Amino acid sequence: ELADFIDKAMIATGPMYNSDLFSVINTTGGNTFNIPTVNDTTVAAEAHTEGGTVTDDAGKDVTFGQKSLGAFAFDTEWVRWSYELANDSIFNVESLLGELLGERLGRIANSKLTTGSGSSDVEGIVTNSGLGKTAAAVAAVTSDEILDLIHSVDPAYRNSPKTALMMNDSTLAAVRKLKDGNGNYLLSMGNFQAGVPNQILGYNIVVNQAMDSLATGKKVMLFGDMSKYYVRKAGGPSLFVARERFAPDYGILGYVRFDGTLANAAAVKHLITA
């Protein structure tokens, strides 16, 4: 006899599709989507002498750039199930498989949007982040190093409501043990049931399991304005069900298209281990 329920294994993935944190752009098609950029932060006005000639040598013209978002495609491969299972099961097999394939698509999206190479691939937020701090140790970070990471980002980005620290859970476990010079824990515990996240110095902590754990030469922590990372969704995730191709059995396939890019590496910086 078969139970009328199924126990499904679970694993946390990450936040990269979260529009409350990142800038998510939804488009119906997959044509290249360009984001204009400009960086005029190193240029200032000059003193003017009465009656003097104003310089006009194009030396301070504004230079514009752009970041491009494509639509990289990913699929789950066909997953098959038997006619007998479809008809004899108490639970809805097709619905369950659709849910599982949706989670598979979510895992690849989170992974690529985090650490994608950007070379004929999605550009992950970690990949294009700027260097904020290099830790002294191979498999540990200190409270001072986290402070240095935070202050490596300009206050213009630090003051954004979407500024946060991002790391995986094993790194967070190490960070939870850190104390300041007065013996107080650096991390302020939140209340997830009440929707209050953990914080460090008032900045929310975002757990992303696609980020590296503490080891040699790993970018284990990000800090900055997460809204400067743009996620492009080309249409929505799709599920295709084949009822005749595998007859008398059935098949189901998941498919999704997306891309991502960090508009300015100064907005989000990483802490890398030695």
Residue ranges and their predicted role:
Residues 1-161, 187, 192-198, 205-206:
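Acidic/polar, low-complexity extended loops/arms that serve as protein-protein interfaces
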